[in-house]
From Swiss-Prot:
Pfam families: GIDA, GIDA_C_1st, SAM_GIDA_C
Protein name: tRNA uridine 5-carboxymethylaminomethyl modification enzyme MnmG
Subunit structure and binding partners: Homodimer. Heterotetramer of two MnmE and two MnmG subunits.
Main location per the UniProt record: cytoplasm
MF term (GO), any: flavin adenine dinucleotide binding
One example of a Gene Ontology biological process annotation: tRNA methylation
Binding site for FAD: G15, G16, G17, H18, A19, G20
Highest taxon above the source species: Bacteria
Cited SUPFAM superfamilies: FAD/NAD(P)-binding domain
Amino acid sequence: MNSAEALAFDVIVIGGGHAGCEAASAAARAGARTALVTHRFDTIGVMSCNPAIGGLGKGHLVREIDALDGLMGRVADRAGIQFRLLNRRKGPAVRGPRTQADRKLYRLAMQQIITEQENLTVVEGGAADLVCDGERISGVTLADGRVLKCGAVVLTTGTFLNGLIHIGEKRFQAGRMGEKPALGLSKRLLSFGFTLGRLKTGTPPRLDGRTIDWQSLDMQSADEEPVPFSLMTDRITTPQIECGITRTTPETHDIIRANLHRSAMYSGSIEGIGPRYCPSVEDKIVKFGDRDGHQIFLEPEGLDDDTVYPNGISTSLPEDVQLEILKTIPGLEKAVLLQPGYAIEYDFIDPRELKRSLETRKVCGLFLAGQINGTTGYEEAGAQGLLAGLNAARRAAGSEPVILQRTEAYIGVMVDDLTSRGVSEPYRMFTSRAEFRLSLRADNADQRLTPLADEVGILSEERRKRYLTRETALSHARMVTQSLSITPNLAGYYDLRLNQDGVRRSAYDLLSYPDINLDRLIAIWPELASIDPVTREALEIEAQYAVYMERQQSDIAVMEREERLLIPSGLDFDAISGLSNELKQKLKQRKPETIAEAQRVDGMTPAAVALLIAQIRKFGGRQKLAAETLEGKGAA
């Protein structure tokens, strides 16, 4: 391979964080010659903020990434040191798998997978500029002058895009603590005509765990039987740890109030808006000042690392104030500060500039993923990265993009929210954002998405075999339980209380009753004892939701019909009589591709949607007439 060929790729991914790793892996698995551009190889997979993966809503995203043969679930399973299933007492649809992770193990596991991935080359260096051929991306210029040619670029800059760190009155440029920001790319993005904004996130101080009084604290243990994220993980073998729990005190709050003027958040130094659901400790005291304390989880950052992450006291107060605060918190009175907490501002692009493929509307072949799109969180970034990387590979190959619908995946919900509604603050995933969350459960992510991964060519043979084995077992168990039935009278003999209506019910039907599980049915049909534990749980959950799923299917069908009703690219919104000028302007700016997308434009009423549909039908009629006219002229 000559030097020109060595610098030519199908897809270039800029950034080696959670979005970048998923993007690079997905593009490479799709068959694209892929380059992952990052400042240093040893920063690939670094967990910039909290040492944890998953949680409520976020755990669903990790399972979906895994179902599409992504990396995050497998890496988290290797590095997880405190697995907990959140919302365990609630229904399966809203349970959230989560684990604290050993930072070093996570980073090393991610680097190993990236290194072993075929079609993927890691290029160390800083991305200085984007190269275009007209309105199409054609390459990337590195800080050292090298030019990498490509057919598509995925930009995953995280907090590095014009990153600015705040610690009290101190401010300095950085992508994260100790690393340079990306300064030139924002100018290039502005020159393309993108709308840029500023967002902010924060992180708490890091503490020396050897100086914490653990004996005085309540402790939280991991689940006795850790539940892996990935289908590819048989069992969790990493040792599990405890974390400590403490609280702020009224004295803590007094110190914070007395120093609010020194906080970057409240002194006017920060322009960007922070995440509502991950507030700084200053925000907590200002907005919830009536509380006598706020909970703090003391999370060890690794099995052989004494660093502790105090989850709950993110701050941009000066370092001396942070030290004073620690002295007022039980168990932390003598804690040594290893790194101060800080806030970081960074540029992002209005995600309404994107198509649902995560390709920008203005520049063909340029894809964005992660915090540059206004999201917060490793899981949100990773999910976007996978979709962007896959579609970048398909763009480079001349194939149609993969679009995930709201009815199919939490990833589809997130992307649709971003591209149709935009963000006014960092976006994070919650189960409440999904209309069809009963069908979009963490436990059925493989069933929903693995066939798609196989269809588009990003599924490994090993995962395909595992998936088919799991599905075959579930299908057989479903068939067996549906073939076994019992009368209400006979069920009463086994202490199962059913309506005495004379209707026979199958074992599968009985599993939908809240007080009936497979253990109780084995007393009636001993052959059911042969169903393995994993299949048993999947079957019980499926049967439990079967009735609700039938009802939800009609709602899903309506939305799918609307998604299929395309808006022609040449439709003149100004020509729609009866539509307000404000809506015409919004539609021209947003360029929705389907009726479903148009419905989610701010201000769209049912009447406005009806006018739009009528105009589409008129447009279709004119197009048909024009085609017939041309055909007639050709025949003449």
